[in-house]
Amino acid sequence: YEIPFGDEIHLTIIAVLLTWFTWAALFTIVMNEFYKFVTLNNIVKFFSVPVLILDIVLFDIYATGIVGKNAFASGDSRLICLAIETVIALSLALSNILVGDKRLPTKREVLTLLGTLPFAILPIMPPYVPQALFGYLDQSVKIEDLTEAHRFVIYLGFIIPVLIFLYYKDKSYEVKRFAMIYLMVAMTWAFIEHYSFDTLSEPWSWPLHLCNTAMFIVPLCLIFRMNKLFTFCLFINVMGALLAMVLANTFDNAMETGSISYWINHYAAFFMPVLLVALKIFKRPGFKEWVWAVVSFAAYFFSMLFVNAWFSNYDAGVDFFFLNSDFIAEKLGNWAIHTRDITVSFTFRGLVFTFYPLYQTLFFIG
């Protein structure tokens, strides 16, 4: 991979910030079409519009940062897509301003805008931003094995939702629901940056890990008020994400894109369902809902058993929910590793399906 701007660090910083802020600008413009809040509208007016104008003025830097060093020389079709996207978004924002309330914000609204803007921008930060702006951390900094840095990151996973709860607990239901939709969809947008259109042609690369599914299920539950599906997130995703945070499976540098994406995913999967109940957006489920969640988990579990065995024929590294490797077993000791010695295999139409009945049964029961 060739760095678009080489040693010209200032251009890299401009391109990274433009891309990040453009994500936020596009997102707020879209949200403003569905939810009518004064603060959101002011963000579109005084943040999103200026950012999109900057995109046009600095289009060579903006486009090169996204498409690559030879974007203009190669005539990449993405340049046209970026230009169309920018013009449509800017036109949409300006049209709303022209037909809407043209008054200037009050002093109180300005203060609210300034206080809200950082929190509107941060959740949608592309995972590569820390690495692009600050580089790698020292390799001695490990966010795994419960090191000091790892514990700090875990503590943040508890502190952040508490702060969000304290801020929103006395707000109206509609404000709380909108804020949580905004937060969850923004984090999902940032999370899927890790994937590309090529991923669609490789099902074994799809985000089918248990915690990955939360990034798509929770927004659906929020937007379409899917109460039954939400119980799956609350009972299953939360516990799975907590275990994943403690048994962190990150091999990248702590500042690398993959690591940041990992924590965006698991923070959201861990605290968002709990936060939604605490804020009374969803009711606290009872025993009946718990039974439904267990049945849903069983369906997911056995589906992943089959999917792992099937897709391993195309990629030996397939390991959805860690059912296909010794990642969990080695954390528990030799006795757990040896449970994988018992295997059952069969061949169907040239494909080999391998299962670990003892290990996978104990995994399910546990």
Model feature map: region roles:
Residues L18-V30, C81-L98, T116, F152-F165, ...:
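Hydrophobic cores of alpha-helical transmembrane segments in multi-pass inner/ER membrane proteins
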Residues I9-V16, A73-T86, Y136-L156, W290-V294, ...:
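Membrane-interface transmembrane-helix boundary segments in multi-pass integral membrane proteins
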Residues P4-H10, L137-L146, L163-V175, T188-S201, ...:
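Short juxtamembrane and helix-loop transition motifs at transmembrane-helix boundaries
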Residues P50-Y62, L117-P127, V185-Y195, N237-N249, ...:
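Aromatic-anchored segments of alpha-helical transmembrane domains
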Residues H150-L156, M180, T199-C211, L234:
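Structural signature of hydrophobic alpha-helical transmembrane segments
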Residues F251-F301:
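A contiguous pocket-lining binding segment that forms or flanks enzyme active sites
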Residues F37-V51, P105-L113, Y173-M184, K228-L234, ...:
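Membrane-interfacial loop-to-transmembrane alpha-helix junctions, especially the N-terminal start
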Residues A63-D76, Y195-S205, F224-K228, A248-S261:
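Membrane-interface helix caps and helix-loop-helix hairpins in membrane proteins
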